[in-house]
Amino acid sequence: MSEEQQVVNLKKKEKWGVAHIYSSYNNTIIHITDLTGAETVSRWSGGMVVKADRDEPSPYAAMIAAKRAAEEAMEKGFVGVHIKVRAPGGSKSKTPGPGAQAAIRALARAGLRIGRVEDVTPIPHDGTRPKGGRRGRRV
């Protein structure tokens, strides 16, 4: 066996996953899976790391949840993640909540490599009728 083949054999295949970040104005959920999405590696939410209900969607709660999820994933041998950010979407809010950006930064700072970041918020193609009535919400 040549020297090149030995080096290739010694080099271990890197394990990558997908970080699904669901961020609404009520909570932030970080769910890390394998690349297929079938196997859950780690799952944390803002509500699991703070006591007060009003703090669940905060960037601080998202940061702590993402840090814990990243630590769990790295213990299981993951070196990097692709990120899918999702807002409630549909007939609800189409913008991610305050915890989305903080969660992405926390995953990177925890030591996970970041691959692709994409927005997977569901967009209605003439789905259900939005709340607010015929004349909309009057402010």
Curated annotation (Swiss-Prot):
Q: Which domain of life is it from?
A: Archaea
Q: Which GO terms describe its biological process?
A: translation
* Keyword Ribosomal protein (UniProt): yes
UniProt key word rRNA-binding: yes
Q: Where is this region: Disordered?
A: 117-139
Q: Which PROSITE patterns match?
A: RIBOSOMAL_S11
Q: Can you list the GO cellular component terms from the UniProt entry?
A: ribonucleoprotein complex; ribosome
Give the UniProt keywords, A-Z: Ribonucleoprotein, Ribosomal protein, RNA-binding, rRNA-binding
Subunit composition? Part of the 30S ribosomal subunit.
Protein name (Swiss-Prot/TrEMBL): Small ribosomal subunit protein uS11
| Source organism of this protein record | Thermococcus onnurineus (strain NA1)
